[in-house]
Structure formats: C-alpha cells, structure tokens
C-alpha cells in the first residue's frame, strides 16, 4: 500500500541565483550575488535590510519591475523573466497589493475616488464600487468615503492605503516601512493592520523594513545584508 505524499506548495516568490549589478560611469556595484530566496505562500515573512539600494532592488525584482539581472524569478509559479513589460505590469497590478509608510493620494479626490482610480482595467464598475465599500467597511472607515485625504488623521490615511491595496483582492501584500522620522506608535499600528489582514483574510504578507523596534510575531525573519540573505536577525 502506497503512502500519500503531499504536493510541494508553490512558493509565493522564488528567486534563484540572482546576480544584480548597479552600473554607473565609474564602476559596477554588486547589489546581489547568487541570491536565492523562497517566500512561503501562507506566511507573514519579515525581511530586515540595511541598505536602501538593496531593498529597492529586491522589491523591483520580485514585483517584476526590473528584469535586468541574471537568475530566475517566479511569482506563484509564473516565470517573471519571460514575460514582456505589459504582462509583468498586469500581473503586478492584479495580484500584488502594495502598502508603504508613505502613501500618496490625490488630494483633490475623496477616499472613494482615490481607491476607484487606483484599480486598472476594471470592466464591472458596479462590482468595483461594491468591493470598495465592502473593503472600507472591513477596515472600519466606510463613513470616511467622501472625505479628502488632507482631512484625515495618519491612522485613517493608513487604513485608506490598506483598503486601496486590498480592493483588488490581491494574492499577497508587499509592505515597506523605513525608519526615517521613526515613530514607535505609528510603526506598531502599521504592524497591527498587517497582522489583522494576514489573520482575517489569510493573505500572505511580505514586510520589508529597516526598523529594529519589532514588537511582533512573524512566521519567518530574514536579514538582507551586503547583498546576501541570512535566516533570522543578523547584526
């Protein structure tokens, strides 16, 4: 009698032997050297970084913005490197929700319109409008739909940013929080919202941060330092 072998889960992001160089007129700076990474499709994963250029390069590679490197990148089994620019943009816009410490809005538009116009290629306008209202309700800010961004508090704006990321029902959330003008309260609230989304919606989270004041529990911590990855925290 044969045993049942569980199929290997497709990784959320899978990077293999990534070599990335930043070329300028004077020299070629090594950003990544043989970088290999698998991000679990169910986990809340934290990547701690030190260098902004490494963080930016990593986000651009896993989201398909940058394919100027050697190696292989997969997103949910999709081989990013063979897709053209339009295909990569479509994959990114439909399947990844982005949330950052600094989130930009159209100040002349209300909350509803800021979210509405952020969704590309929406064919069913009625369905989209219902999705926006339901998403605002899930974040507890449905009464703010007609408010302009400049009239909202920092916490309320962050909830709007999360609503904008979630309204398209993404396969994952990529979040970035840097320690410029760091506020522990703001960071803790940012983490609280991420944890809530991960728990309530079962959406995998990838948080990339250079903050050291971490009052949180995640499934995996990875350190990005000098173009290499290490399991756990590394000083």
Give the location of each predicted region.
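ABC ATPase NBD coupling module
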Residues: 80-97
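Helix-to-loop junction immediately C-terminal to a conserved catalytic motif
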Residues: 63
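Q-loop/switch helix immediately C-terminal to the Walker
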Residues: 102, 109-121
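Hydrophobic anchor residue at the start of the ABC signature
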Residues: 161-162
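Conserved ABC ATPase "signature" region
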Residues: 127-144
